[in-house]
């Protein structure tokens, strides 16, 4: 492994860790950054699975007490059973639609132009959602109804379009459906666990032949980097939302998306030939 390859692994690990749980689209950033630094091909597909697992492991570690409380409370606590049922219900739409359409979406939509467009549209929707007046019916994730979970699960499917953002769609969906900002954010984190693990297992099995022993050092660097920065992002976001709205992320999405579209429109970067 040469220095440049190690540097690429660090950069992409940082990008994955920082963006996976922020409402700015980790997939979109990965596609754009990977294209800029020339990290692609079969190794990149396997590498992305590894760094996504690292990011979700950071969330599991951060919420380990809540997870253990739910696991040990399944037999005796109705709240734990309801929370688990809500997670499974919210997870199912992504399973069905992911299996049916994942290959088509990857083939036709995994490119920087789609990402940039989705970033802008998602940013505008995020601003609208934050500025509208909405009542809070659910203050805590344990108080969610099955209907809340199912609706958030369907909204999560929008994130199959790169640039939309899984966390962004579920958080904003939660706000629109009556969840508090804290409840919507926490449920988004918890929903990420089965969703991302399921996607990683599916992709890992599908592309199992791409994992080569010679790539272990690159994978290790990306894994550790992604884990560390995902932990920073999760803790930072939970503190941020206590006193702030998501407007800053919305403006970032719009500005970043417009920048990508401008570089393409004026011919500074030929994004149209790029593919994730």
UniProtKB/Swiss-Prot annotation:
Keyword rRNA-binding applies: no
A Gene Ontology molecular function term of the record: undecaprenyl-diphosphatase activity
Annotated keywords: Antibiotic resistance, Cell inner membrane, Cell membrane, Cell shape, Cell wall biogenesis/degradation, Hydrolase, Membrane, Peptidoglycan synthesis, Transmembrane, Transmembrane helix
UniProt membrane topology term: Multi-pass membrane protein
GO CC term (a single one): plasma membrane
Assigned EC number: 3.6.1.27
Location within or outside the cell: Cell inner membrane
Class of this enzyme: hydrolase
GO biological process, one term: peptidoglycan biosynthetic process
Catalysed reactions, as listed in the record: di-trans,octa-cis-undecaprenyl diphosphate + H2O = di-trans,octa-cis-undecaprenyl phosphate + phosphate + H(+)
InterPro entries in the record: UppP (IPR003824)
Keyword set includes RNA-binding: no
Role description: Catalyzes the dephosphorylation of undecaprenyl diphosphate (UPP). Confers resistance to bacitracin.
Miscellaneous comment in the UniProt entry for this protein: Bacitracin is thought to be involved in the inhibition of peptidoglycan synthesis by sequestering undecaprenyl diphosphate, thereby reducing the pool of lipid carrier available.
Family to which this protein belongs: Belongs to the UppP family.
Identification of the protein by name: Undecaprenyl-diphosphatase
């Amino acid at each position: 492994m040469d220095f440049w390859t190690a540097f690429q692994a660090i950069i992409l690990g940082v990008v994955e860790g920082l963006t996976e749980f922020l409402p700015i689209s980790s997939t979109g950033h990965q596609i754009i950054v990977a294209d800029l630094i020339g990290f692609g091909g079969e190794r990149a597909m396997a590498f992305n699975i590894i760094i996504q697992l690292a990011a979700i492991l950071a969330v599991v570690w951060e919420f380990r007490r809540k997870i253990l409380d739910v696991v040990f409370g399944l037999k005796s606590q109705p709240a734990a059973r309801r929370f688990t049922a809500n997670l499974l219900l919210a997870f199912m739409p992504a399973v069905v639609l992911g299996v049916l359409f994942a290959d088509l979406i990857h083939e036709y939509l995994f490119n920087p132009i789609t990402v940039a467009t989705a970033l802008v549209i998602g940013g505008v929707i995020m601003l609208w959602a934050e500025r509208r007046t909405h009542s809070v019916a659910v203050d805590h994730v344990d108080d969610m109804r099955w209907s809340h979970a199912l609706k958030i699960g369907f909204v999560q499917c929008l994130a199959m379009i790169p640039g939309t953002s899984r966390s962004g769609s579920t958080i904003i969906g939660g706000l629109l459906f009556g969840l508090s900002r804290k409840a919507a954010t926490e449920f988004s984190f918890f929903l990420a666990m089965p969703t991302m693990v399921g996607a990683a297992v599916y992709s890992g099995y599908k592309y199992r032949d791409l994992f080569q022993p010679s790539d272990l050092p690159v994978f290790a660097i990306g894994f550790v980097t992604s884990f560390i920065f995902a932990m920073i992002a999760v803790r930072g976001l939970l503190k941020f939302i206590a006193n702030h709205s998501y407007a800053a992320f919305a403006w970032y999405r719009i500005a970043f998306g417009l920048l990508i579209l401008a570089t393409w429109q004026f011919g500074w970067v030929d994004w149209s030939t790029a593919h994730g």
